[in-house]
Amino acid sequence: MEPRAVADALETGEEDVVMEALRAYNRENSQSFTFDDAQQEDRKRLAKLLVSVLEQGLPPSRRVIWLQSIRILSRDRSCLDSFTSRRSLQALACYAGISASQGSVPEPLNMDVVLESLKCLCNLVLSSPVAQALAAEAGLVVRLAERVGLCRQSSFPHDVQFFDLRLLFLLTALRTDVRQQLFQELQGVRLLTRALELTLGMTEGERHPELLPPQETERAMEILKVLFNITFDSIKREVDEEDAALYRHLGTLLRHCVMLAAAGDRTEELHGHAVNLLGNLPVKCLDVLLTLEPHEGSLEFLGVNMDVIRVLLSFMEKRLHQTHRLKESVAPVLSVLTECARMHRPARKFLKAQVLPPLRDVRTRPEVGELLRNKLVRLMTHLDTDVKRVAAEFLFVLCSESVPRFIKYTGYGNAAGLLAARGLMAGGRPEGQYSEDEDTDTDEYKEAKASINPVTGRVEEKPPNPMEGMTEEQKEHEAMKLVNMFDKLSRHRVIQPMGMSPRGQLTSLQDAMCETMEGQLSSDPDSDPD
């Protein structure tokens, strides 16, 4: 049914005609997400008519059908202005049961009305900054948090619980003030951790499910997404003992999520959200990933249960096969594995054995091949600086932050970016709590070590001498041509001569020489100022 015909029916005011027109429109457009520009003005007119009645108050018999029509039109950005008034948003919040102005004992809720209202609010908040601001001002997060906290006692159906969480996710993703309010005033981490525990069936006395059902999977992922939003900067925050205990408890739930299978084909998606949130936890709280006791069937390494680390490594390898959005898919799991390896020697040695086994193939460049090491070395020269940084950091930590060992496995050319950023171009080792474990060399590596090109990280055939057969005069002529070419490039600032500063960082040759001379003068006791 055309929007003009529906609008005409609404203007008649005859209830039977109005409801029949709206039912037909809803039925025909329930799956419409794009709209014809030619009918834009008709849809705007229809939206205004729907909103005017919504703001005055809908009789119970009309609410579901009316809200369904509003939900469909709220997908159309050209109609948003009609729906984003303070009165219309307040009306939707009241029908959803999340208005702060409602009394402590609100009227009984019709769950179909609640669900349609929540869907309308989600559409509006997603698409309209005005709706986002009005929702924040109205304090919808307070009632949403109350409902999430009552999920065990409430008789709300799955769809309502899910869209409560979806609206909470959108508000915390799009509004900093709502994020802070949920985190600080409403104790969002504690509240949502408890909700996650209940959703996963992890409470005392309950048998832990081996396969998470579809509805619980959907709700768990929404909870993880909201937790990610409100803990986004907690990794940078100092936490006291009470908060650390809470984050460790959350970490145990995330560990369970990583080990859990989800119904259908959503296991990797669930694991992805859990890994993203693990990356937000304070580093000292990640020790819970390695506190599972070894048991029959578990992977034990140096007396430690490595099941979680193995799953995370397998998850990372799957993500490496993706060719798009590597930053979102690979960086979080690499960061988590890096911190586990940095803090825990058994985890580092296990990961090194899997990722950087003793070198045998010394004739292939480190970035060539389909081994996990090859894939990670390729990421070290990725266009995205965050991707190459986390990949290099992970391999560097697996090498116990030893520069020679890092160069051995990756080649100096691939390693140069991280070494320059760390001020380690001159070698050395940063401060770190690493044991002096030996890096066992294979016989193949020992035999070829002297012939390995440190820049490429492989044995290369000796190239022919380009000056072979030239006279001394010809050699001198070619050398001067080369000098003149470099001089021209330098004078036109196409290239800049670089040197190594005393701190091990690349800098201009002139600055490097000045710093070196200043260092020598300051360390010479016989030197006096002029």
From Swiss-Prot:
Subcellular location, record wording: Cytoplasm, Cell cortex; Cytoplasm
The protein, known as: Chaperone Ric-8A
The protein's role, per its UniProt record: Chaperone that specifically binds and folds nascent G alpha proteins prior to G protein heterotrimer formation, promoting their stability and activity: folds GNAI1, GNAO1, GNA13 and GNAQ. Does not fold G(s) G-alpha proteins GNAS nor GNAL. Also acts as a guanine nucleotide exchange factor (GEF) for G alpha proteins by stimulating exchange of bound GDP for free GTP.
Record-listed Phosphoserine modification sites: 435, 501, 522-523, 527
Gene from which the chain derives: RIC8A
Residues recorded as bearing Phosphothreonine in the entry: 440, 442
Alphabetical keyword list: Chaperone, Cytoplasm, Guanine-nucleotide releasing factor, Phosphoprotein
InterPro entries: ARM-like, ARM-type_fold, Chaperone_Ric-8_A/B, Gua_nucleotide_exch_fac_Ric8
Source superkingdom: Eukaryota
The species this protein was found in: Bos taurus (Bovine)
Family under the similarity heading: Belongs to the synembryn family.
GO cellular component assignments: cell cortex; cytoplasm; plasma membrane
Subunit and partners: Interacts with GDP-bound G alpha proteins GNAI1, GNAO1 and GNAQ, and with GNA13 with lower affinity. Does not interact with G-alpha proteins when they are in complex with subunits beta and gamma. Interacts (via C-terminus) with RGS14; the interaction stimulates the dissociation of the complex between RGS14 and the active GTP-bound form of GNAI1. Interacts with NCS1; interaction is favored in the absence of Ca(2+) and myristoylation of NCS1 is not required.
Pfam hit, one: Ric8
GO annotation terms (biological process): G protein-coupled receptor signaling pathway
Single Gene Ontology MF annotation: guanyl-nucleotide exchange factor activity
PTM annotation: Phosphorylated at Ser-435 and Thr-440 by CK2, stabilizing its interface with G alpha proteins.
